[in-house]
């Protein structure tokens, strides 16, 4: 089964065109060399949130795609598939009507994905999801650096490990490898397997040596449309070629399927073995001429527990190893059993420091968990949840026995909107406050810029009151950095206001549907703001429409959708998704959103709303919210904003930087930083602080301001009509602190390509900060590089290695391509 070459050329053209997009379907291209050859393969991927999005039409839905010469699909993974209830089309009710059997239910093995394919040359291609062959970080064990450095341990390369496992499977028989490559090429197939080996990389479930290897779970045709072989043929292939294989079951109808899935989820096991869940393979219902043999379609059914608890154990252990006291470690759920686990681990690490060191390096994670289970005389992780419930009851009973209910845990809630101007958040929050007067509504627009107490301070002050359980945190929070600031500030200050018995939960109120385009968001919200005129504390469209337009565009440009799979949004305990109606009657949309919030809270937080308000009362309180007239006025005109820029920088293309982090993506020291990766990347040319250090700094700063201009002081960041070509030199990781990229500016030029040689960067060590682990901050990237390059006359780049600089341990990774350049990166000015 093959596509025509012209169809694949058209696909590659679309993929290449998509690399030029900024969002909504942008593709990222990586070029790899097939192992032990000079054959180039192009790897393609899209941004995670673009998959399964109705408003984004991707050229192909494959997750894991490699092409050859822009005319051949060499490797083809599965189409991206989603969990039951994760998307509208994977709701259980929809799946029962939109798909048909046979439903092949495969066990979800717990490792890293490996693709295997063959080329016409007889070469085998073994890939991870997005790379194949050698990388710069695959150091030889005897590699050395300078006298002050030690050799770094090899970073895990999944593709190379997959290749190694395959060769071992064939007892080192290279001829057998070539035979497999020939077979796959002739049949236009990609093998999809799971690499499970705890000695290489631990995940959640254990795979001892006798269970480790490549588990085949799919054979895909290398075609644009997703086509995969049925499991009986996959099993036959695996046995013929000596692979391990996943178990599977078959159900003919969806009712029997879901009955089985729900039953297994009660214990988190299948045949007495803990598993992560199942992948279900079926076909879409086709409505053409009554034919039901539709396209291949996958979905997954993941068990929530005990795997969320296992992951929480892993995360809190990292915090413990970083020196955070147990009482200060943030625990989202199952606090009693997690605290008991932490107390056990703290003692274990004191007695056996080798286990602690292994844990820091990504090993013995499962061993520690199993030792904890043994200490409780348990073998089943699901029983930990029962113990958690028992411990919780014991704490409550102890509090009652002591005549002090105050010792029991009290839950308080902060409702955090994710919105832009004009989404209706204040109307919705005013309505909720009218319905529930005991809730506190704090509007950021009512807080003066000069006020000492900001919105986070006022939130904590409100929650000090025993009678206050909810704060409506009325601010847009459109950018993820603003959400991060909420979590960070409240965590830092909560001990000044709340004791340990208060459990804080963050409820995200998402006002912007994921399928809404940027253009639609602008049209809806701008029309709403124009309609309300000056009835707002700061956004007065009747008085100054141009200023309002500028401010609104700034919010939309900074908007980053909520993504609970990564930091900081993974700290939300619950998300309520609202609607944003294109209807001219915007109040209708806001009233519907009030009802959505109430219904969700009644279902998920019954202690919060014990009795659902009557429709008449909701309508009455909503009308009162519509009649609301703000009395506080916040001056947003230009003369209230600082005229002096804070800093100048070069905005770096976000996706391009991310894709070049591949060389450290599996490095043990980078793992801790992964959850702290910044939401934007830039190179700082100069900061106003430099003008206050010495005369030379003042001269350079004034020259920057004069040459580049001040942009628009009404915006936090303003694009300038200058561009730079930037060379990426090397990645530097400061252990448990930060990661940054050392860079070189090749040239700066204006829109007419006229060189601007008079623009001189003030920063001595030009860099891009990738991410910082609190309390480290971005400014420490500069300090890190100054430590590493303490000789100002040193021109040569440090080779790969580990360097001890004072109290810091630095790890250097040079890029495989020594000529890695990003062109036409735009300069900007920032005001803070």
Curated annotation (Swiss-Prot):
Could you tell me the EC number(s) of this protein? 6.5.1.3
Question: What keywords is this UniProt entry annotated with?
Answer: ATP-binding, Endonuclease, Hydrolase, Kinase, Ligase, Multifunctional enzyme, Nuclease, Nucleotide-binding, Transferase, tRNA processing
Enumerate the Pfam families for this protein. Answer: RNA_lig_T4_1, tRNA_lig_CPD, tRNA_lig_kinase
Record organism: Candida albicans (strain SC5314 / ATCC MYA-2876)
Listed under catalytic activity are: ATP + (ribonucleotide)n-3'-hydroxyl + 5'-phospho-(ribonucleotide)m = (ribonucleotide)n+m + AMP + diphosphate
Role noted for this protein: One of the two proteins required for the splicing of precursor tRNA molecules containing introns. The ligation activity requires three enzymatic activities: phosphorylation of the 5' terminus of the 3' half-tRNA in the presence of ATP, opening of the 2'3'-cyclic phosphodiester bond of the 5' half-tRNA leaving a 2'-phosphomonoester and ligation of the two tRNA halves in an ATP-dependent reaction.
Give GO terms for biological process: tRNA splicing, via endonucleolytic cleavage and ligation
Q: What is this protein called?
A: tRNA ligase
GO cellular component terms attached to this protein's record: nucleus
Return the similarity comment.
Belongs to the TRL1 family.
Q: List the signal peptide residues.
A: none
EC top class, as a word: ligase
Q: Where is the active site?
A: 108
MF GO annotations: ATP binding; endonuclease activity; GTP-dependent polyribonucleotide 5'-hydroxyl-kinase activity; phosphoric diester hydrolase activity; RNA ligase (ATP) activity
Which InterPro entries does this one have?
A: P-loop_NTPase, T4-Rnl1-like_N, Trl1_fun, tRNA_lig_kin_fungi, tRNA_lig_PDEase
**Domain comment (free text):** Has three domains each corresponding to an enzymatic activity, namely in N- to C-terminal order: ligase, kinase and cyclic phosphodiesterase (CPDase).
């Amino acid at each position: 089964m093959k596509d025509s070459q012209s169809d694949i050329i058209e696909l590659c053209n679309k993929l290449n065109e998509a690399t030029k997009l900024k969002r909504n379907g942008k593709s990222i291209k990586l070029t790899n060399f097939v192992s032990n050859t000079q054959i180039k393969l192009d790897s393609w991927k899209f941004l995670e949130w673009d998959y399964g999005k109705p408003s984004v039409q991707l050229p192909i839905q494959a997750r894991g795609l490699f092409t050859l010469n822009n005319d051949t699909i060499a490797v083809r993974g599965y189409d991206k598939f989603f969990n039951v209830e994760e998307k509208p089309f994977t709701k259980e009710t929809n799946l029962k009507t939109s798909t048909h059997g046979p439903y092949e239910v495969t066990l979800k093995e717990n490792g890293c994905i490996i693709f295997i394919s063959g080329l016409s040359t007889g070469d085998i291609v073994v890939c991870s999801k997005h790379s194949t062959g050698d990388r710069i970080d695959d150091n030889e064990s005897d590699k050395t650096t300078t006298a002050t450095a030690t050799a770094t341990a090899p970073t895990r390369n999944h593709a190379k490990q997959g290749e190694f496992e395959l060769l071992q499977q064939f007892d080192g028989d290279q001829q057998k490898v070539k035979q497999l490559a020939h077979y796959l090429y002739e049949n236009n197939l990609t093998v999809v397997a799971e690499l499970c080996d705890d000695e290489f990389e631990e995940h959640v479930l254990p795979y001892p040596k006798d269970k480790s290897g490549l588990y085949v779970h799919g054979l895909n045709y290398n075609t644009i449309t997703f086509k995969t072989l049925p499991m009986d043929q996959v099993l036959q292939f695996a046995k013929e070629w000596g692979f391990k294989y996943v178990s599977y079951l078959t159900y003919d109808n969806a009712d029997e399927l879901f009955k089985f899935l729900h039953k297994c989820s009660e214990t988190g096991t299948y045949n007495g073995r803990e598993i992560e869940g199942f992948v279900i393979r079926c076909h879409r219902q086709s409505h053409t001429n009554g034919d039901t043999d539709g396209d291949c379609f996958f979905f997954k059914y993941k068990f929530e527990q005990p795997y969320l608890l296992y992951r929480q154990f892993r995360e809190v252990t990292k915090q413990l190893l970083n020196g955070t006291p147990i009482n200060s470690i943030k625990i989202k759920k199952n606090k009693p059993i997690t605290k008991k686990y932490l107390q056990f681990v703290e003692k274990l690490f004191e007695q056996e420091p080798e286990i602690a060191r292994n844990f820091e390096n990504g090993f013995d994670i499962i061993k520690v968990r199993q030792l904890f289970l043994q200490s409780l005389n348990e073998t089943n992780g699901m029983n930990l949840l029962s113990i958690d419930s028992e411990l919780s009851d014991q704490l409550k009973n102890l509090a009652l026995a002591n005549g002090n209910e105050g010792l029991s845990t009290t839950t308080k809630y902060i409702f955090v909107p994710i919105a832009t101007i004009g989404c209706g958040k204040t109307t919705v929050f005013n309505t909720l406050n009218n319905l529930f007067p005991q809730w506190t509504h704090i509007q950021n627009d009512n807080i003066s810029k000069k006020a000492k107490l900001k919105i986070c301070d006022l939130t904590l002050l409100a929650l000090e009151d025993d009678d206050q359980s909810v704060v409506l945190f009325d601010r847009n929070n459109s950018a993820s950095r603003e959400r991060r600031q909420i979590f960070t500030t409240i965590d830092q200050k909560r001990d000044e206001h709340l004791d340990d018995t208060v459990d804080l939960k963050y409820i995200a109120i998402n006002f912007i549907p994921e399928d809404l385009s940027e253009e639609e968001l602008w049209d809806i919200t701008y029309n709403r703001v124009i309609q309300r005129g000056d009835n707002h504390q700061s956004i007065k469209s009747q008085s100054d429409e141009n200023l309002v337009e500028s401010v609104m565009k700034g919010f939309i440009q900074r908007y980053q959708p909520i993504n609970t799979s990564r930091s900081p949004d993974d700290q939300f305990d619950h998300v309520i998704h609202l609607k944003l109606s294109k209807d001219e009657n915007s109040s209708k949309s806001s009233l519907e959103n009030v009802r959505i919030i109430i219904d969700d809270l009644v279902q998920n937080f019954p202690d919060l709303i014990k009795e659902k308000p009557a429709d008449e009362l909701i309508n009455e309180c909503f009308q009162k919210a519509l009649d609301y007239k703000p009395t506080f006025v916040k001056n947003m005109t230009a003369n209230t904003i600082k005229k002096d820029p804070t800093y100048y920088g070069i905005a770096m293309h976000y996706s391009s930087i991310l894709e070049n982090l591949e060389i450290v993506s599996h490095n043990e020291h980078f793992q801790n930083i992964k959850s702290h990766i910044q939401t934007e990347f830039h190179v700082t040319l100069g900061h106003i602080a430099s003008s206050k250090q010495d005369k030379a700094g003042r001269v350079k700063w004034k020259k920057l301001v004069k040459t580049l201009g001040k942009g628009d002081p009404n915006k936090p960041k303003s694009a300038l009509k200058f561009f730079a070509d930037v060379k990426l030199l090397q990645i530097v990781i400061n252990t448990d602190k930060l990661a940054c990229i050392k860079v070189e500016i090749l040239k700066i030029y204006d829109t007419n390509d006229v060189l601007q040689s008079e623009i001189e960067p003030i920063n001595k060590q030009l860099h891009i900060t990738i991410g910082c682990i609190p309390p480290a901050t971005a400014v420490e990237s500069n300090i890190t590089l100054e430590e590493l390059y303490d000789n100002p006359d040193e021109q040569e780049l440090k080779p790969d290695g580990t360097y001890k600089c004072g109290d810091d341990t630095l790890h250097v990774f040079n890029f495989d391509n020594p000529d890695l350049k990003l062109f036409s990166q735009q300069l900007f000015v920032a005001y803070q």
